[in-house]
């Protein structure tokens, strides 16, 4: 198989076995979601056709038969719609993950950040000068995290200030 891929000049021929396995798993997920979508659409089609009301020659076509159950019909419609929506969404998500070579949420975040220019924006923002108030807050938080700030001393000062105001 690799010889054929080299002969046809495919880049995946030079890829590692781990990469090929990863792409294979992504492909299997997409095709599984596609198969579920096909089965769900066939189920929805059959559910719709079985509930179709076909009147006889002299019956009106505007009123359903007396044995018709609206509650069951509504429940089947909601369930079928939810099944179709979920399966199409899964197929779309797995298809995009296969195209973008993404296997988990963290990789999706990295990929979107790189595609939308997030790395450059973050670099520019980190190089920007910080204003005085933000610098003071950052230094205070760092002091608290480093254990340099004494909370007991601060509460004594607050109590002393409260006593003076009373």
From Swiss-Prot:
<dbReference type="GO" id="GO:0016020">
    <property type="term" value="C:membrane"/>
</dbReference>
<protein>
    <recommendedName>
        <fullName>Altered inheritance of mitochondria protein 11</fullName>
    </recommendedName>
</protein>
<keyword id="KW-0472">Membrane</keyword>
<keyword id="KW-1133">Transmembrane helix</keyword>
<feature type="transmembrane region" description="Helical">
    <location>
        <begin position="27"/>
        <end position="49"/>
    </location>
</feature>
<dbReference type="GO" id="GO:0005739">
    <property type="term" value="C:mitochondrion"/>
</dbReference>
<dbReference type="InterPro" id="IPR038814">
    <property type="entry name" value="AIM11"/>
</dbReference>
<keyword id="KW-0812">Transmembrane</keyword>
<feature type="transmembrane region" description="Helical">
    <location>
        <begin position="78"/>
        <end position="100"/>
    </location>
</feature>
<comment type="similarity">
    <text>Belongs to the AIM11 family.</text>
</comment>
């Amino acid at each position: 198989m690799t010889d054929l891929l080299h002969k046809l000049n495919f880049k995946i021929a030079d890829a590692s076995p781990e990469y090929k396995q990863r792409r294979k798993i992504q492909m299997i997920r997409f095709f599984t979601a596609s198969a579920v979508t096909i089965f769900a659409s066939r189920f929805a089609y059959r559910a719709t056709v079985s509930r179709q009301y076909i009147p006889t020659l002299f019956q009106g076509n505007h009123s359903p038969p007396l044995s018709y159950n609206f509650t069951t019909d509504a429940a089947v419609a909601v369930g079928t719609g939810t099944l179709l929506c979920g399966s199409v969404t899964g197929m779309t998500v797995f298809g995009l993950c296969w195209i973008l070579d993404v296997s988990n949420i963290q990789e999706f975040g990295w990929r979107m950040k790189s595609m939308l220019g997030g790395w450059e924006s973050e670099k520019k923002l980190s190089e920007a000068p910080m204003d005085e108030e933000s610098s003071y807050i950052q230094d205070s938080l760092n002091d608290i995290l480093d254990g340099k700030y004494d909370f007991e001393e601060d509460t004594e000062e607050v109590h002393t200030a409260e006593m003076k105001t009373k």
